[in-house]
A protein has these predicted regions:
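Alpha-helical transmembrane bundles and membrane-interface segments of multipass inner-membrane proteins
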Residues: 1-175
């Protein structure tokens, strides 16, 4: 019973974090649509950073333009994979970071997925004009932070054997 209670607590926190972050992403996009669509950019730091409304029908750096069905399929596959991961991931303090990373990454995927389903494109609005960096949004920030977290976790925090929970094969008994 204690294990089930801990599992429910971890999954509950994972889901709450996903929902809060997805709502934050959608709220920022709603503000941008309301205040920036068909308007001039809002310059925050002249020559460096501004808010710029953009309807992105592709992926990062403009690849895969107008391939909505591909993004929908990939997001569904990703969501199935992350829920499998969260189901398999140990529910203890040692793995809290992985739960957080998976939840933040999922919020990023869901935020852009909702845009694609609802609008047919993703609303982007952060623009670093100084380096002409592609316009991005809060969900994109969640994805990037998550991938950095994954890299740091793999390289510096967890040992290889701590990822055995991801193995599909059954452990051989040491008899």
């Amino acid at each position: 019973m204690v294990k089930n209670k801990k599992t429910i607590q971890f999954i509950g926190v994972d889901c709450i974090l996903m929902v809060i972050l997805t709502l934050l992403d959608q709220w920022t996009k709603s503000l941008v649509v309301h205040h920036l669509k068909d308007q001039s950019d809002i310059i925050l730091i002249p020559g460096v950073f501004q808010l710029h409304y953009l309807e992105n029908r592709g992926a990062a750096f403009g690849i895969l333009q107008n391939q909505r069905i591909i993004f929908v399929i990939l997001t569904i596959i990703y969501l199935a994979a992350v829920f499998w991961f969260l189901h398999r991931c140990p529910k203890n303090g040692r793995y809290t970071l992985l739960h957080i990373i998976a939840s933040v990454l999922t919020a990023g995927a869901l935020g852009n997925f909702i845009d694609r389903l609802r609008l047919g494109y993703v609303v982007d609005f952060f623009y670093f004009s100084l380096i002409n960096f592609p316009v991005f949004n809060v969900a994109d920030i969640f994805v990037v932070i998550s991938f950095i977290g994954i890299a740091v976790s793999i390289l510096f925090i967890y040992k290889d054997d701590e990822f055995e929970f991801l193995s599909i094969r059954k452990k051989e008994s040491k008899a």
